[in-house]
Amino acid sequence: MPQPLKQSLDQSKRLREAEKHLRELENLVDSNLEEEKLKPQLSMGEDVQSPGKGEPLHPNVRAPLSHVVRAATIDLPRLGNKLPAKHHLGKLSGLYQMKGCTFNPEWKVPDISDTHFDLQVVNECPSRNWKYLTPAKFWPKSISYFPVQAGVKAKYPDNVMQHEAIVGKYLNRLYEAGILYKRISKHLVTFKGKPYNWELQYLVKQHQVPDGTTTSKINGRAENRRRRAPAKSISRPHDSERDCNMVGQISNNRSSIRPCANNGGGKHSSTTGRLACWGGKTIGTDQSYSSRDASASVDSRGRSKSSRGFSSISRRKATGNHHHCSYVTNSVEATTRGRSTPGKQVFTRDSSSLPESRASRACDKDSSPQEEENAWYLRGNTSWPNRITGKLFLVDKNSRNTTEARLVVDFSQFSKGKNAMRFPRYWSPNLSTLRRILPVGMPRISLDLSQAFYHLPLNPASSSRLAVSDGQHVYYFRKAPMGVGLSPFLLHLFTTALGSEIARRFNVWTFTYMDDFLLCHPNARHLNSISHAVCSFLQELGIRINFDKTTPSPVNDIRFLGYQIDQKFMKIEESRWIELRTVIKKIKIGAWYDWKCIQRFVGHLNFVLPFTKGNIEMLKPMYAAITNKVNFSFSSAYRTLLYKLTMGVCKLAIRPKSSVPLPRVATDATPTHGAISHITGGSAVFAFSKVRDIHIQELLMVCLAKIMIKPRCILSDSTFVCHKRYQTLPWHFAMLAKQLLSPIQLYFVPSKYNPADGPSRHRPPDWTALTYTPLSKAIYIPHRLCGT
């Protein structure tokens, strides 16, 4: 219970007790651990051992945490040098010493479906976010290009060819699903699936004009792209010589084979018209050529290496695939035989059944495995480089599924180095925010998006900056890849817009984080029906749900963002605590551990730290090792402290009641004296043993007031004290101060209104005029999550 100060406190027994505590706090401050004990001792070697080497870990679980903390300040951990040290701490290892991936020649490429959301979602889910997503844009400041042959990382030196083959299958699967563009030439790519509205203006559209030339309608503008005006001739009936001469002219013309998008019209544009491809069908012939030949013949700029004769082209094609030669000869025969009257085209297929404004490669009957239906040609407002910007390799899909492969895309050049970009920030809830927004006592359902990043379309010009290759073909990401720092921001915008509409339309509490949706409602039966309606609503818009990770029915206990959440509390799974205790037990006292290994260990401790009675200052010695990149050695007492933290497990309440207690205790300090004042009129003045910085003297008095009176809140005129950021203080004093002041609120009061300002200057306290405010920053919560 709070013990109010009395007027005669300075004459009582408790004054001597308070002075004793003050001297202990001053000793903690004066033993400057940060400069003497934790600075990098570069002269230390492996023979330096901690005093508690070999002692078994038997922490006294019943001992107060404060006793364990004080023991850790006596038996200190040590920093070492940069010599090689242990890279393994239990099951943890240094980030660069992680277990290497094992190549699996039986890796299967996972099923990847076409994720094409309907643009009607812009009207169904009104949000300003869509202007950033339809399409998304990616403009790096500068780009480093790599050769196509370096497209697959040499992750598995013994299985290079097999690795590249599986990567090629994976990329082809992504291309078939409409996620990648495939390069045809410098100005032309092809893709599959349904085109977006902004792609329609770049699709290749060919139209026949009366004089026989071909025009390409690009960017909504039709223009004649002939390089040389053909000599017009008068049509004569039964002109057999013209037909015969046409074959010779075609074979000798340097632009004999014309692409689907003809930028430079040749002398014999009727041939060009017959080679045009529309809607997955062939116009003018039944024969086709493969995608590799298309890269040579579909270039619309006339810059293809076609200076050789038609016969040489035919021979070159025949060496690669035997059916290419048959295509060329048959197409020529169709050109010469299929002309019944000059100036007209005779199609061997019904062109009325072909959809408009569509181009695809023609396919031969003998090459049915290479047939590409539902393919489109696109010439964007950019050039498509025959180089790459990212590299690829394969790993296991996860630790539980080693039969399927996962494609890892390395676009790290855009996040570090000379090409580093500053990606936009977005709201992400921390643990404190999550506690305050989750509704209490409601059943919950979790939904998970399937292939979430592949829902986000990119502008074609941006796609050309995200080039990858399997060593054979060059692909460009048509949808957002996972290896770019912009993708999480885009996904946040995407799911936030959907979550807002779901909450409004279905009257259900909705929270989204990346690809996870959390739905809550007081009525479990109603929530169950809502979840089915939400899934149907999303699927109608082309948004895919991963039902394997979706909660089938409302539950009270759910795992979300790594936390176990029930109706009233949040906690950490017991299995995680057991793993962490096992790691701590395997710490060898006095052994030197590499800082990368310590870095991983600190990451695990940080995740569970809010669920313990500890604070971040307890990890400061390990942070010092990480910052200075030196080895770290655990002491026996420090290992016991870490183990003690994992034993005092607690659960955090959802929607904690926020109370604003009235301040009854105030503190103040000068370089030589400190004072504590109570609202009842009692006060006490203390003399410091030495002059220190004023912010340290202020913190000493606040800690003393907490030890002696145990108030719910304290007034102080020091912003340093009120912000509770004590990283610059000596480690053991900062750790104790953080431990003492974390449970209570500190209010800032201006010095002229501070009731303890008078006693510290030998004047009576004044509680009549009191103005104070908390300096803690209010937690930001989105407006749509505030009203529940």
Swiss-Prot record:
**E.C. code:** 2.7.7.7, 2.7.7.49, 3.1.26.4
Region ranges (Disordered)? 26-60, 211-274, 288-372
Here the segments flagged for biased composition (Basic and acidic residues) are 358-368
Kindly state which reaction or reactions the protein catalyses. DNA(n) + a 2'-deoxyribonucleoside 5'-triphosphate = DNA(n+1) + diphosphate; Endonucleolytic cleavage to 5'-phosphomonoester
**What protein am I looking at?**
Protein P
Biological processes per GO annotation: DNA replication
What is the species listed in this Swiss-Prot or TrEMBL entry? Duck hepatitis B virus (isolate Shanghai/DHBVQCA34)
- Its gene is P
Which region ranges are annotated with the description Terminal protein domain (TP)? 1-200
Q: Where is this site: Priming of reverse-transcription by covalently linking the first nucleotide of the (-)DNA?
A: 96
Pfam families the record matches: DNA_pol_viral_C, DNA_pol_viral_N, RVT_1
